[in-house]
Amino acid sequence: MNTYEELQDEACKDGIEIIDNHSFKSDRISGLYCNNTIALSKNLKNSTEKACVLAEELGHHYTAVGDIIDQSSAENRKQELRGRIWAYNNQVGLRGIIDAYLHNCQNLFETAEYLGVTEEFLNDSLTYYTNKYGVCTQVD
């Protein structure tokens, strides 16, 4: 079972419907969560991209309250970030980075492939962890 299928199972267990290959009015929208339904864009190319977007939308399910589409609001931006952080921790995490290293992943591509995420998602998560912890931290 790949990462996308695992996330689909998690969503199903939580009573969340997933609409795959949705046509959004804007190509900039890759996913949307509303009322226990997650819609994923038809423009997502593969299961890895779908997994990254689904993880973030699940993060919104678990962490957001209300309609956060209007990103001009500081509170909505904070909730957007919380959903993204949930996805980073769920799909990558510090332990995942360590495991990738222990499995001899040598670069961003190998690490992303090992973790089942896109290089962009991994890079964004690494930026988040660097901002939070600096270049070094201890993990129990």
Place the predicted regions along the sequence by residue:
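Active-site hotspot residues in diverse enzymes, especially metal/ion-binding acidic/histidine motifs
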Residues: M1-D140
